[in-house]
Structures are given as C-alpha cells and as structure tokens.
A protein has these predicted regions:
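Acyl-donor binding region in acyl/amide transferases
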Residues: 1-114, 118, 125
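Glycine-rich loops and low-complexity Gly/Arg-rich segments
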Residues: 12-14, 49-54, 141-146, 156-161
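Short, intrinsically disordered/low-complexity patches at protein termini
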Residues: 33, 48-49, 139-141, 154, ...
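Alpha-helix boundary/capping detector
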Residues: 42, 132-134, 159
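Short, highly charged low-complexity linear segments
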Residues: 68-74, 146-148, 163-171
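Extended effector regions of multi-domain proteins
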Residues: 98, 128-132, 138-140, 166, ...
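C-terminal/domain-terminus segments
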Residues: 104, 115-153
Length: 180
C-alpha cells in the first residue's frame, strides 16, 4: 500500500511539472462502511477541526452521519496544535483496534492549508464513504514537493537520454546539470 501511495504522490508531482498553471488538487479520501464507526467519526471530527472549509465552498450531497457524540470526540481531541492532536487521534484510533487509513494519513501530512469539505456516501461505489479535499499546490510542504517532483524530473531526464541520444550529445553535460 505504501508503494502505491508513493506512486500516487509521484503522479501528483508529475502533474505539477506537466501542468504548471495548476494551482489546486481537488480529490477525495475513501473509507469503507466496514471501517470502525467510532474511529471514522473521530477522524472526520479531527479533519473538521484542523482542515475545515470555513467558506463552505463544497458540501456533500449525501453527507456522512456522525454517530459518535461530539462531547466524547472533543474529550479525546483536546489539543489545538495539529501534531499534538494527531498523536491523540492516532492513539485512540489504535485503541479502537484499527489504524488511520494510509491515504488519509498521507493527505493530512501534505499541507497545513488542506481544506476538508466533509464526507459523503458514494452509492455507486459499494457505499464507500468519501471525504472531499482541496490542496493548494503552493502550500504543499517543500520536503514533499522535493521528494516527488525531483524523482519525476530525474526519470524524465533518464527517459530523454535513452530515447533521444542525439539530443544528449548536443546538450552534453548541460542536461545532467539541469537536475543536479
């Protein structure tokens, strides 16, 4: 699963290079109905707390019904800082016998300004519970950009060297210097 996530992030890095006018990534995180309800509600509550869409840009057509009392969730998620609150979330989710889904975990650590628009039920995809998000490319942590964009550029240069040897001869070391 983690290798697949790396491929996903490398793909987003490629999009950023191939489509430099792209400012936002709009997508979703998926959890399935079998996932622990209380853990799901706690994750949703955490996402609202730290990534709420205050402008109400998007709303789900068929929103998730949060079944866990807000008072309970507030008693668990007591920190104002993301990192400290995340530790509390992770501990409680594990206590409930599950882990935070890897994709959800990855998105939460991608950008401090991610917007979460709420979760909804996708009736056309096995009743999957999908949470809509928006990430500004400019706000993605530099370490994440470097890791996934650099790999794309290196792969692109390797491809050019192999596919167009005459171009490489004409460019000489300049092509290598472009990615060094």
């Amino acid at each position: 699963a983690l290798f697949a996530l790396d491929n996903l992030w490398d793909g987003l890095g490629a999009l950023a290079i191939e489509r430099p006018n792209m400012k936002y990534f709009f997508g979703k995180m998926t959890m399935y109905p079998e996932y622990n309800r209380q853990a799901r509600d706690l994750i949703q509550h955490f996402l609202f707390k730290h990534f709420e869409d205050k402008e109400k840009l998007v709303t789900p057509v068929d929103p998730l019904k949060i079944e866990t009392p807000v008072e309970y969730m507030d008693s668990i998620l007591t920190e104002t800082e993301f990192k400290e609150d995340y530790k509390l979330l992770n501990a409680e989710v594990r206590r409930l016998g599950v882990n935070i889904p890897p994709l959800v975990n990855s998105y939460m650590s991608l950008s401090p300004t991610m917007k979460m628009f709420g979760g909804g039920i996708n009736h056309e995809f096995s009743e999957a519970e999908e949470t809509c998000i928006l990430i500004s490319f400019d706000d993605i942590y530099e370490t994440k950009k470097a890791r996934h964009i650099d790999s794309f550029i290196k792969e692109k240069v390797a491809y050019i060297k192999k596919r167009f040897p005459i171009f490489v001869e004409n460019m000489g070391e300049n092509l290598t210097d472009m990615v060094a």
